[in-house]
């Protein structure tokens, strides 16, 4: 999804 989705999944 977004550029930070890989660590902002929560």
Swiss-Prot record:
Cellular-component GO terms for this entry: extracellular region
Biological process per Gene Ontology, one example term: neuropeptide signaling pathway
Modified residues (Phenylalanine amide): 10
Source superkingdom: Eukaryota
Cell location: Secreted
UniProt key word Secreted: yes
Protein name: FMRFamide-like neuropeptide ALAGDHFFRF-amide
Organism: Mytilus edulis (Blue mussel)
């Amino acid at each position: 999804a977004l550029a930070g989705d890989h660590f902002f999944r929560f």
